[in-house]
Regions:
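N-terminal basic/disordered segments at the start of proteins
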Residues: 1-11
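Residue-level signal for beta-strand positions within conserved beta-sheet cores that form or flank
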Residues: 6, 55, 141
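Intrinsically disordered, low-complexity, positively charged segments
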Residues: 10-46
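Ser/Thr-centric signal marking residues that sit
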Residues: 13, 84, 129
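Structured loops at beta-to-helix junctions and adjacent beta-edge loops in soluble globular domains
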Residues: 14-16, 62, 86, 148
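Phosphate-centric recognition/catalysis
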Residues: 37, 41-117
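Surface-exposed, charge/polar-rich loops and edge strands
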Residues: 90, 98, 105-148
Length: 148
């Protein structure tokens, strides 16, 4: 069986392979948990090198149903979902016990990253994200969702 390559790459990481010291050891990517900022920056640089992308959008996740459309790397927006049509822009979601959702519509060129916590899920974060994607040209029949 040959799998057709997708033009959108969806990546999940684990906590191994980075430089953060305990209790954040070792591949912590969150800059909001008390880890050494230099370690987080080094881990993020390592991720960028591994996947070959340098432009990221990291969210300030607040357990809301807020969806933000982005078109360039930026300081973390206060949101729980980011959507873009910009090629080469990586959208990042951080989770511990929440569900990360990575969405794409290859034909429309729309991607999204969603932080689906209990409150956001109850308040339709996924539905709001899909609506936002559709407002940018995405169609339900060509959308792909990967749950982490």
């Amino acid at each position: 069986m040959t799998l057709k390559p997708r033009p959108v790459h969806k990546v999940f990481t684990t906590r191994t392979g980075g430089v953060s010291a305990a209790p954040f050891d070792s591949f912590n990517l969150g800059d909001h948990v008390g880890d050494d900022p230099q370690a987080v920056a080094a881990n993020r640089a390592r991720l960028a090198s591994i996947i070959g992308v340098s432009d990221f959008v990291w969210m300030e996740q607040l357990h809301t149903n807020t969806v933000t459309v982005v078109d360039a790397p930026q300081i973390a927006p206060a949101t729980d979902a980011v959507v873009t049509t910009q090629r080469g822009l990586a959208l990042a979601v951080l989770t511990a016990d929440c569900v990360p959702l990575l969405l794409s519509d290859d034909r429309a060129g729309v991607i999204a990253a969603v932080h689906a916590g209990r409150l956001g899920a109850r308040n339709d974060i996924l539905l709001r994200t899909l609506d936002t994607m559709e407002s940018l040209g995405s169609k339900p029949e060509t959308q792909h969702v990967l749950l982490g």
